From Swiss-Prot:
EC number from the UniProt entry: 3.4.16.-
Keyword match DNA-binding: no
Gene Ontology process terms (BP): proteolysis
Protein name (database record): Vitellogenic carboxypeptidase
Catalytic residue positions: S207, D391, H448
Cellular component GO terms, alphabetical: extracellular region
Induction text: By 20-hydroxyecdysone.
Family membership noted in the UniProt record: Belongs to the peptidase S10 family.
Amino acid sequence: MVKFHLLVLIAFTCYTCSDATLWNPYKKLMRGSASPRRPGESGEPLFLTPLLQDGKIEEARNKARVNHPMLSSVESYSGFMTVDAKHNSNLFFWYVPAKNNREQAPILVWLQGGPGASSLFGMFEENGPFHIHRNKSVKQREYSWHQNHHMIYIDNPVGTGFSFTDSDEGYSTNEEHVGENLMKFIQQFFVLFPNLLKHPFYISGESYGGKFVPAFGYAIHNSQSQPKINLQGLAIGDGYTDPLNQLNYGEYLYELGLIDLNGRKKFDEDTAAAIACAERKDMKCANRLIQGLFDGLDGQESYFKKVTGFSSYYNFIKGDEESKQDSVLMEFLSNPEVRKGIHVGELPFHDSDGHNKVAEMLSEDTLDTVAPWVSKLLSHYRVLFYNGQLDIICAYPMTVDFLMKMPFDGDSEYKRANREIYRVDGEIAGYKKRAGRLQEVLIRNAGHMVPRDQPKWAFDMITSFTHKNYL
């Protein structure tokens, strides 16, 4: 999800001599403001941590129940968990219990990318129970992942979406801190819903979530806290996980026919220079080079747009049609009755439009890798990497590039493994490969946001992974 105003990815940072201009990947997908339209009518935000600390668990659950006519057809809960009292840092969440087999269904956390993209994009645009039509009506999604999962959508890191902090020191500057905050959140979540503690626990996300998901998994794996979380696996879609091994854009775009040899030379030179900058820890230099290729510098047209004609790099078939899908989500979230119903009051919604503080604070993290964490996690848990065939910014070949270079239990098996056809109800949904605890999947006719482009196949894929171990 990159160039996605609610969804995903690299969020490279471009610096001028006087200020920081942040690449805003979701800008084209989420337009407008989610500020309350009628101040004073949105109720108060619900902070659950004080209630939990006082042992008022049932009261907290009752207060967290989402109460809005357009959302009442599906049981759900929302509110804030404080993860850093010193800086008043709070994570907003929206929990949707499983529709079927509630007593045994696995838990599935969803983390959007960005960084700075709200997971409410994933909830309303990709895999949640609700979809908002252009006429502002709310419809139920046919292939909602809550049908057989307890879904938890978290605005992560602090400062994303409705999540907030009162201090610059409350923002995350690295993935360790992201994981720590998510760990503090989930510990409180299980106090609020203790009946879920023994359920199989999975973490999923896309784009820059390719870092957040392993960060959360690694924090759980290393935690000595009791009771233990029943972590079973991780699922990463079009993930930005090992950046320096996922920058081979020149070859990829050339093979697609989107650039010629001159364009390939420019991409190869600039990505090589970015890698050199990153290796000497000059992230400002590295980010600026990638920014120039994909989003433009100092108000100038990006090189990608100059040579391809496209601004969006989510789907090379749809091109800029992808960016013209006008989302009404922002307007929906500005409705005072909605805000009151989901317990956010008049708190601002940080949507990555304009100054993206989350991305700014994580600018030194942009090109860092979490591959060593993935490698360690693969020794204990199942990990699914899936990609849309038509994605550019987190393309399938680049995911394979980093997986082929990553040492893990089963790496030699992965290099030898044959790919199989993945079918859903007789249709060719894509291709799959398995080695050790690693599952790799390519979904046909999908771009950066696989669940949105191919909802039926994505639903089958995630269900097979969480319920049958492998596809």
